[in-house]
UniProtKB/Swiss-Prot annotation:
This is Pyridoxine/pyridoxamine 5'-phosphate oxidase. Substrate binds at residues 9-12, 67, 124, 128, 132, 192-194. Its EC number is 1.4.3.5. GO terms for molecular function: FMN binding; pyridoxamine phosphate oxidase activity. The gene is pdxH. Transmembrane segments: none annotated. It comes from Chromohalobacter salexigens (strain ATCC BAA-138 / DSM 3043 / CIP 106854 / NCIMB 13768 / 1H11). The lineage of its organism: Bacteria, Pseudomonadati, Pseudomonadota, Gammaproteobacteria, Oceanospirillales. Keywords: Flavoprotein, FMN, Oxidoreductase, Pyridoxine biosynthesis. It holds the Pfam family PNP_phzG_C.
């Protein structure tokens, strides 16, 4: 199978991004860009690629949804017993990528990862649709299963178990917070002369530095 995709390209012409105009905190710039993405992207502005590594150093990536953002970092929720959960237990670092094609913008993030508090996970779980709450019990994420009937049978079983009762959060399900130490903002520009601004966190000074990178 051979696809000729060498000619797949587009022109870029976004807003100018400079070190001088960028705020001191990258999370402030992230919030500004994220608000614009929510306004202009057709759907899933909070979708982000999450990359982790296993115990052998092999990378694995998948798309997850950003569900909370605060001064500490970015939060997503998942099954702690999944492949990514196991990888984050062994190597508690991750990379994130947001891509917003309408705005011609990308944000790349690297950071340390910690579990969100039980209070944060409980509060988010309580606001999920009931079917999604049950799904957290039904699916043994990343485990090989024989067929879809296996899922449907577990669905019926848990619906009977809970009936009209409140569905509690499973102990194996909850949030992770990515604590960034690097953020890179990319803005598409004409002639492939794109704008790239990189922030690094310096723990000793408890401060961010920012610099411009060649495209």
């Amino acid at each position: 199978m051979n696809y000729d995709i060498a000619d797949l390209r587009r022109d870029y012409a976004g807003e100018t991004l400079s070190v001088e105009s960028a705020p001191a905190s990258p999370l402030d710039l992230f919030q500004t860009w994220f608000a614009a993405a929510r306004e202009h992207e057709t759907q899933d502005a909070n979708a982000m690629t999450l990359a982790t590594v296993d115990s052998q150093g092999l990378p694995h990536a998948r798309v997850v949804l950003l569900k909370q953002l605060d001064d500490k970092g970015l939060v997503f929720f998942t099954n702690y017993q999944s492949h990514k959960g196991s990888e984050l237990t062994n190597v508690p670092y991750a990379a994130l990528v947001f891509w917003w094609p309408t705005l011609q913008r990308q944000i790349r993030i690297e950071g340390r990862v910690e579990k969100a508090s039980a209070e944060v996970s409980d509060a988010y779980f309580a606001n999920r649709p009931r079917d999604s709450q049950l799904g957290a019990w039904i699916s043994q994420q990343s485990v090989e299963i024989p067929d879809r009937d296996w899922l449907e049978e577990r669905k019926q079983r848990f619906e009977q178990v809970y009936g009209e009762q409140t569905v509690e959060r499973p102990p194996h399900w909850g949030g992770y917070r990515v604590l960034p130490f690097l953020l890179e903002f990319w803005q598409g520009q004409p002639n492939r002369l794109h704008d790239r601004i990189r922030y690094r966190y310096h723990e000793q000074d408890a401060a961010w530095s920012k610099t411009r990178l060649a495209p």
